[in-house]
């Protein structure tokens, strides 16, 4: 065993997985996990914990894995995380916990994410559940949204003894975990549904098909329904577009809609209740994880897929692992390329996308070099479907129906970073509804912070 290198993790063969929706990464078995855990040197001042947005005791759980104590490892993790099987799969560990790992200075960091996944999966298979509160405190909290922020906040509050009800607008709980991330990265029945069951086992109730702002307002929850506090974790589901000619053509989707139709509605299957055509040649505009998810989904539906991104590969915001998997599967990357027009036929259907070549200039406000058009470099990519993956912003329904709840110029709810408190008394918020589109783990961290803020508020009320 070379302690400087990670224990390899098994994956589906790229040629095989490109034709199915089964999970790509197969994870560690017990022997592999214990071998990888033995690489951890159990630092006294563990920087990996500081790199984790929910502050999991990483050396603590890894030590238990090394000793074969899966249940003990799970209880250590579940003290900090309500969704370990999710985080072990989709967190950007390379820039967080693993990015801080001391092992990474002279070799490869410990595979913290893969070990977390192993523990969560093993606990699920053994029927191990997180430990809940011994007794309730008699206070009620409403949580809006059942995505990662809402589930985390609800789980933490339930552990503190609160009676918690989650209100979800869709017919299935899970938020972006269900509609946004494809099965190839995050299985829905085997993983997401079980994680939600674990949160419910803590005493959390979930009501679906409740659109807060229409079905019921926040003021009504506080004044008429008897809730002592409200947490808003409704995410950011309003897609952004470029504003170029042709965006209204048939065959143009936001990534949000495309993935929801595929993941939640199965609309690209012929026997679906809401079937729609899926393209043979698809362009996905954008370079984040959502763009990779949309591209890899389109590939599995039989399309030739192009990722169209205006910067170079170094600036791609997607995880290195996701880019690597996409390339392995045969997705074409048109880098330093920017769309200027979506072309359509006489019936209004997409039949191409006109692009222009770019070069990188001086850094912009994000710190990345600004892309500049190369004059006279326009060309057309032959496609019949265009998926726009340019980010999302919060839906204004909640903010527009709640008196005293202030938003910023980006339409995001204003909340204090250290406690989640909004401008309306008794109302807290976190996740994408506050920050705009970000990662699952950052939303979880915000939900955890807000739970502490709510507990402090109600304890002193």
Q: Where does each model-flagged region fall?
A:
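FAD-site-proximal beta/loop scaffold in flavoenzymes
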Residues: 248-279, 363-437
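Glycine-rich dinucleotide-binding loop and its adjacent helix/turn
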Residues: 119-135, 192-214, 239-301, 408-418, ...
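Feature captures the FAD/FMN-dependent oxidoreductase FAD-binding
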Residues: 72, 135-136, 140-144, 196-244, ...
């Amino acid at each position: 065993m070379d302690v400087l290198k990670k224990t390899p993790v098994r994956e589906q063969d790229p040629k095989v997985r490109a034709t199915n929706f089964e999970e790509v990464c197969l994870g560690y078995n017990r022997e592999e996990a214990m071998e990888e855990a033995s690489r951890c040197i159990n630092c006294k001042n563990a920087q990996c914990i500081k790199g984790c947005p929910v502050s999991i005791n990483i050396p603590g759980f890894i030590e238990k894995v090394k000793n074969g104590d899966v249940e003990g490892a799970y209880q250590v993790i579940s003290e900090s995380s309500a969704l370990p099987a999710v985080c072990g799969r989709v967190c950007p560990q390379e820039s967080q916990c693993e990015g801080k790992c001391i092992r990474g200075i002279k070799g490869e960091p410990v595979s913290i994410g893969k070990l977390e996944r192993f523990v969560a999966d093993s606990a699920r298979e053994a029927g191990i559940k997180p430990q809940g509160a011994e007794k309730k405190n008699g206070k009620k909290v409403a949580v809006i949204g059942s995505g990662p922020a809402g589930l985390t906040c609800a789980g933490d509050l339930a552990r503190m003894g609160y009676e918690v009800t989650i209100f979800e607008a869709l017919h299935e709980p899970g938020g972006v975990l269900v509609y946004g991330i494809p099965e190839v990265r995050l299985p829905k029945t085997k993983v997401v549904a079980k994680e939600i069951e674990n949160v419910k086992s803590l005493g959390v109730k979930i009501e679906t098909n409740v659109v807060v702002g229409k079905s019921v307002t926040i003021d009504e929850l506080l004044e008429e329904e008897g809730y002592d506090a409200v947490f808003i974790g409704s995410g950011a589901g309003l897609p952004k577009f470029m504003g170029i000619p042709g965006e209204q053509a048939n065959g143009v989707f936001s990534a949000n809609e495309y993935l929801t139709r595929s993941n939640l509605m199965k609309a690209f299957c012929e026997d679906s209740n809401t079937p729609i055509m899926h393209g043979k040649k698809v362009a996905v505009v954008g370079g984040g994880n959502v763009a990779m998810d949309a591209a890899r989904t389109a590939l599995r539906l039989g399309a030739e897929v192009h990722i169209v991104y205006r910067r170079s590969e170094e600036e791609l915001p997607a995880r290195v692992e996701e880019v690597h998997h996409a390339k392995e599967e045969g997705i074409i990357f048109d880098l330093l390329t920017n769309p200027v027009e979506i072309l359509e036929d006489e019936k209004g259907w997409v039949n191409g996308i006109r692009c222009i070549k770019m070069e990188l200039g001086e850094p912009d406000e994000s710190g990345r070099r600004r892309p500049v058009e190369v004059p006279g470099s326009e060309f057309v990519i032959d496609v019949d479907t265009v998926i726009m993956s340019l980010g999302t912003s919060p839906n204004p329904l909640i903010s527009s129906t709640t008196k005293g709840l202030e938003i910023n110029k980006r339409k995001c709810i204003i909340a204090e970073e250290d406690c989640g408190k909004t401008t309306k008394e008794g109302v807290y918020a976190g996740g994408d509804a506050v920050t705009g589109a970000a990662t699952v783990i950052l939303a979880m961290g915000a939900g955890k912070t807000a739970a502490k803020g709510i507990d402090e508020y109600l304890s002193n009320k």
